[in-house]
Design a protein with these regions (language model features):
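Conserved GNAT-fold acetyl-CoA-binding loop/helix
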Residues: 21-42
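A conserved beta-turn-beta hairpin within the catalytic core of GNAT-like acetyltransferases
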Residues: 71-82, 92, 138-139
Length: 150
């Protein structure tokens, strides 16, 4: 198998949307994404000047992606917020995600990014990220303010 690691291109968005739909369709998420919703998420994530995206392509299809944005702070502190990271189910548990992290980290280091961060849910996802060197942060608290009634 020959995998191509590269930066995302606009032409990849539909293939990325297919990958996102497949990745979240089953346990533990069971999210019923439509193609339109998945495309909107990808387009919105990639719309800013600070957006970065990395993909793995195999036989013309995107099988994994890491999308996010650079956050800029004082004293030249830069971190990359991973907004979307997934591997198509058929390719999971084969080291593809680990390889994508390594590729993305190498690319981001070239831009003087000091750290990666993300928000995730579910024990399976937490275990995956911990195995790949992520640490649980106790800095801050995620808070939400509902704008609609439940």
């Amino acid at each position: 198998m020959t995998f191509v690691f590269r930066e995302i291109q606009k032409e990849d968005y539909t293939s990325c949307a297919d990958s996102l739909i497949a990745a979240y369709a089953n346990e533990p998420w069971n999210n019923p994404w439509t193609l339109e919703e998945a495309l909107l998420r990808i387009e919105a994530t990639m719309s800013g000047f600070n957006a970065r995206g990395y993909v793995i392509e195999y036989e013309g299809n995107i099988i994994a992606m890491c999308l996010g944005r650079i956050d800029y702070y004082f004293q030249n502190w830069r971190q990359f917020c991973i907004d979307e990271f997934n591997v198509t189910p058929h390719y999971q548990r084969q080291g593809i995600g680990r390889q994508l992290f390594a590729f993305a980290a190498t690319q981001l280091k070239k831009e003087a990014i000091q750290q990666l961060f993300l928000l995730t849910g579910g024990a399976q996802a937490v275990t995956f990220y911990e195995k790949n060197g992520f640490l649980t942060s106790n800095e801050g608290t995620m808070m939400v303010y509902p704008l609609t009634e439940a």
